[in-house]
Amino acid sequence: MSSFEEYFSKHASEYAKSKSHKSGEDLKSLLTIVNPESSWKVLDMATGTGFTAMAIAPFVSEVIGLDATEEMLSNAVMLSEKSGLRNVKFIKGRVEHSGLEGGSFDLVTCRRAAHHFPDKTAFVVESKRVLKDGGLFALIDMVRPEKDKDNVRNRLEILRDSSHVDAPTVKFWSDLLSKNGFREVETISTKERIAFPDFLSPVNVDSEEGKACLDYLKSISRESLVNADIDPDDLSIIKERVIFLYRKVE
C-alpha cells in the first residue's frame, strides 16, 4: 500500500466528518465561478469522500467521482446515498490514467488533493484528455508562498502527512497549465490564518507526527518562519488556497 493510500485509509472517517471539506468557502467559490449547467457531465478527480462531487451534482446531469483509496470511496458512497443524490457515481482510479473515455466531460474538478500527486504533469495531461474541447478545468489546492525559498511549508506538511508530495507556487501551476493546452479563465486566491492545532488536523498535537512538526518549527530561524507565512511566536499559519479555472484550448 502506498503512503497516500495508507494515510487516507487511516483517516477516511475523519475526512467524511470534515466541515471544511463539506462546506468550505473554497467550495462555495468554485460553484459560483464555474456556474455549472444542467446538461454537463462532470469528473471530480481525487474525490475523497465525495463532498465536491455531491455539491456539484444538483446542478448538472451526471458526476463521476474518482479516487484511488477504497476507504474514501466507501465513505463517499455512504454519504451520497444518505443525501439521496442519484446522478453521482464513484469509481476507483488514478488521476494520472483514469481509464475514462477521452473528450467526454464538460468540467473536470480537483479540490484539496493535488499536493499528494507525484506526477502533476501527468495529472494535468489526463485532465485535458478527458475534457471536451472548450471544457473547463477547475483546480483548488494549497500553494507555497513564493518567498518560502527554504521550502519550510512542504517540509512541515510531509512531517504531518507522509503522503504529501509538494504544494507548489501559483506560478508553477499557471505555467504548467498554460504549457499543456489550457487557457486561464480566472484565478482566485483565499487566505486564512489558522492555529497550529487546526493546521495539524486530523493529526493530533500529541501524536508522533504532531510532535515532529513542533520540533521542526522550533529548530528553524524566525526569518524562515516569516517567509513561510508562519508566526514565530504562536506558530499560527497563513494557509493560502487558490482556485485555478482554466479552459481546454480547442
Task: Cite the ranges covered by each PLM segment.
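Short alpha-helix
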Residues: 166-181
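A short glycine-rich, Lys/Arg-flanked "PGG" loop and its adjoining helix->strand segment in the class I
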Residues: 121-136
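Short catalytic micro-motifs in class I SAM-dependent methyltransferases
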Residues: 112-113
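Conserved class I S-adenosyl-L-methionine
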Residues: 1-40, 51-55, 71-75, 79-83, 138-161, ...
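Class I SAM-dependent methyltransferase SAM/SAH-binding core
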Residues: 43-97
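Conserved Class I S-adenosyl-L-methionine
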Residues: 49, 120, 184-250
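A conserved beta-strand element that flanks and buttresses the S-adenosyl-L-methionine
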Residues: 109
